[in-house]
């Protein structure tokens, strides 16, 4: 993943990382991670930092090596690109550009990509993503739905990569009772 970074980006990240690597051993503490990221223009929340730390600090030693940090920054940059992709995807669905995806707009876009949906299916998709219950999907709801889909995909990929005995259809993330996840997958 870090191989997707330019030499200039790697140099910038190394410089920021080095500022906090006080003893020059090539690692920083997890507590310093937020400070380093903020110095690079990122603004992670405390919860995001905890997620990143648990993802990166695989040996739970409280230190993050530069290589791990590069992987993390590459993911953050890719996620930033993903945000632009989400905005563009939302605009595709939001035909009248009013900031909401209606059932009619959803049905129209899905039909254009070859998915003929019944009124009931469209209604289920809307209600699964419609957190505020107004009968439409706003941008925040769209993002939550898509991010949930992305998380499920990462979990499945990790499970497959780890060689777990569970299949993609096993476990709570793919259980039929979890309609929310299944409906968002179509979006």
From Swiss-Prot:
Main localization (coarse): membrane
Binding-site residues for Ca(2+) 1, renumbered to this chain: 21, 23, 25, 27, 32
Keywords recorded for this protein, A-Z: Acetylation, Calcium, Lipoprotein, Membrane, Metal-binding, Methylation, Prenylation, Repeat
Subcellular location: Membrane
List of residues binding Ca(2+) 2: 57, 59, 61, 63, 68
Modified sites of kind N-acetylalanine: 2
Membrane topology category: Lipid-anchor
Keyword Transit peptide found: no
InterPro entries: CALM/Myosin/TropC-like, EF-hand-dom_pair, EF_Hand_1_Ca_BS, EF_hand_dom
Residues modified as Cysteine methyl ester: 184
Binding site for Ca(2+) 3: 94, 96, 98, 105
Lipidation (S-farnesyl cysteine): 184
Domain EF-hand: 8-43, 44-79, 81-116, 117-152
Biased composition (Low complexity): 169-178
PROSITE patterns associated with the record: EF_HAND_1 (PS00018), EF_HAND_2 (PS50222)
Basic and acidic residues compositional bias, start-end: 154-165
Region (Disordered) residue spans: 153-187
Pfam families: EF-hand_7
Binding site for Ca(2+) 4: 130, 132, 134, 136, 141
Protein function: Calcium-binding protein that binds and activates CAMK1, a calcium/calmodulin-dependent kinase.
Assigned protein family: Belongs to the calmodulin family.
Annotated protein name in UniProt: Calmodulin-like protein 1
């Amino acid at each position: 993943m870090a191989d997707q970074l330019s030499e200039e980006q790697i140099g910038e990240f190394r410089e920021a990382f080095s500022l906090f690597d006080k003893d020059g051993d090539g690692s920083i503490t997890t507590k310093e991670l937020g400070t380093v990221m903020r110095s690079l223009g990122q603004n992670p929340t405390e919860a995001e930092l905890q997620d990143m730390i648990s993802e990166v600090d695989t040996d739970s030693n409280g230190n993050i090596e530069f290589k791990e940090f590069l992987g993390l920054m590459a993911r953050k940059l890719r996620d930033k690109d993903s945000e632009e992709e989400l905005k563009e995807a939302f605009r595709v669905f939001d035909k009248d550009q009013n900031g909401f995806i209606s059932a009619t707009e959803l049905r129209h876009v899905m039909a254009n990509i070859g998915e003929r949906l019944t009124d009931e299916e469209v209604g289920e998709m809307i209600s699964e993503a419609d957190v505020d219950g107004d009968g439409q999907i706003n941008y925040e709801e769209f993002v939550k739905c898509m991010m949930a889909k992305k998380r499920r995909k990462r979990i499945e990929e990790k499970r497959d990569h780890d060689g777990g005995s569970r299949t993609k259809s096993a476990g709570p993330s793919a259980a039929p009772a979890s309609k929310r996840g299944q409906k968002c997958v179509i979006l």
